[in-house]
Every structure is written in structure tokens, then in C-alpha cells.
């Protein structure tokens, strides 16, 4: 796989292969945003397994869709059925998983969509990597801050039980580190009611003029 680098001026990911060139399009992101009636952004939900990332991202997508906002939800489990099905859970594979998702999210932002992503994404460097792919203001980090004890009590997929029994290695929060965001754009307390958290998210999006109502 050829190495890639980010162009600071237009946020294009460029290949080091001189035979591969970037083809600009006549229709711009701004044109698409005008047609959609809102900005294209990424809301990056991060937190432990069982923290409520997928639940909140799904509920927010429903709320936005009902308001006429063009959205797409990228879920950590779903992308491993196709886009990232060849990857495991080593540090290198986890980084590549997030890199691929970041590139897809960037394309969707260029299409003028509000992109919601639900990934543990345990390392700050990985989240920063995605942020650096996007223009200023296009990446909104949402930290779903739910205590480990609550996540483990929920354990919707039985993964904590397997990790505690030694049947699942490198599980974030048990034998693999989770690096909490130092200064997330949105800090949610995951024990609160989903309806309350969705209102908090909508308030931020309205305050940033990403959505109108």
C-alpha cells in the first residue's frame, strides 16, 4: 500500500505515487451543503464498550433525520463486516481500522452529510489522525463518559464477561488501555437518560449553526 500524506491547504489525502493524481470536481462541498441546507461534519463518538456510543449515535441520527438533515452512521461493528473485515484487534490493525473509517467519513463530509461515528477508538493519536484529515470545525469529538462499572454491568454483547474470564484478549478497559479525550468538544455523562443527552447534542449543533432547528 503506498504511503499517504495530508495536504494542509485543501485537506486532500495525497498518495506518494506520482502516477496517482487528485481529480477536482465541478460540484464543490459548499454546493452540496447548500443543497442539503446544512454543513457537513463528523461527530466522533468515543468511549468504552457499553458506554452508549452506538445507542446515542443512532438516536441522534433519528432526531436529525426527522429534521430533514442528511446523515449517515458509521458503526464500529458494522464496518468490520465489509470495509475492515480483514483487520483484527492489534494496535496496528486498530489504527488502520480508524484510518479507513476516517477516510470514508471525510468523503461523506465532502458530500455535505452529517456523519455520526461510533467507535471505541481508544487512543488519542488515532482520533487526532482523523481530526487532521478534516478542515477546522468539521470534526466534533463526543466523549461518552460512562464509568467502567456501569459499562461492565450493561455488557450488551457479553464481552466484558469473556475478557474477565481470559477468553478475550486486548479488550479495552480490562487489559488494554483507553485514553480519555483531554478536551472533547462534547462531554456526555453516559448514565443520563438518552433523551437528555440527545437534547444536549442538538443544542451544540444549533449553537454551532450546523443545523437550524
Curated annotation (Swiss-Prot):
Residues annotated for ATP binding in this entry: 47-54
The protein's GO terms of the molecular function aspect are:
adenylylsulfate kinase activity; ATP binding
Among Pfam families, the record links this protein to: APS_kinase
Q: In its UniProt record, which GO terms are filed under biological process?
A: hydrogen sulfide biosynthetic process; sulfate assimilation
Query: What pathway or pathways are given for this protein in its record?
Result: Sulfur metabolism; hydrogen sulfide biosynthesis; sulfite from sulfate: step 2/3
UniProt catalytic activity:
adenosine 5'-phosphosulfate + ATP = 3'-phosphoadenylyl sulfate + ADP + H(+)
Which keywords accompany this UniProt record? Answer: ATP-binding, Kinase, Nucleotide-binding, Phosphoprotein, Transferase
Q: Taxonomically, which superkingdom?
A: Bacteria
Q: Which residues form the active site?
A: 121 (phosphoserine intermediate)
Which protein family is named in the record?
Belongs to the APS kinase family.
Name the UniProt record assigns to this protein: Adenylyl-sulfate kinase
Q: Where does this protein come from, organism-wise? A: Yersinia pestis
Provide the gene name from the record: cysC
